[in-house]
Swiss-Prot record:
Annotated residues for binding of iron-sulfur cluster: 42, 106, 108
Cofactor(s) listed in the protein's UniProt record: iron-sulfur cluster
PANTHER family: IRON-SULFUR CLUSTER ASSEMBLY 2 HOMOLOG, MITOCHONDRIAL
Assembly behavior: Homodimer.
Protein name: Iron-sulfur cluster insertion protein ErpA
Superkingdom of source: Bacteria
Keywords from the named record: Iron, Iron-sulfur, Metal-binding
Origin species: Cronobacter sakazakii (strain ATCC BAA-894)
Length: 114
């Protein structure tokens, strides 16, 4: 998908830059950042991030700056309207999801409820 199409999930420049850097470190240009939702965490659902070299049937792919973000259909329904970002701060550096669908989140921001 191109940058000028309205997307159900945003992939920020900061996240794309970090993915590009990590892929270069791994020396595997086929890697993509996969974001997914699983049950668990202190709020009911939790975000997960992993590098994957596969795109499965039904996955949505967002390309930015030559790298890809991949989301499975089940996870996408909980992420619509959100943004995958990368932050650096006192608590460390990490990928985060800014999710307008979450009615509450835990203190660390890695789990949420709807």
């Amino acid at each position: 998908m191109s940058d000028d199409v309205a997307l159900p999930l945003q992939f920020t420049d900061a996240a794309a830059n970090k993915v590009k850097s990590l892929i270069a470190d791994e020396d595997n240009p086929n890697l993509k950042l996969r974001v997914y939702i699983t049950g668990g965490g202190c709020s009911g659902f939790q975000y997960g991030f992993t590098f994957d070299d596969q795109i499965n049937d039904g996955d949505m792919t967002i390309e930015k700056q030559g790298v890809s973000l991949v989301v499975d259909p089940m996870s996408l329904q909980y992420l619509v309207g959100g943004a995958v970002d990368y932050t650096e701060g006192l608590e460390g550096s990490r990928f985060v999801v800014n999710n307008p669908n979450a009615t509450s989140t835990c203190g660390c921001g890695s789990s949420f409820s709807i």
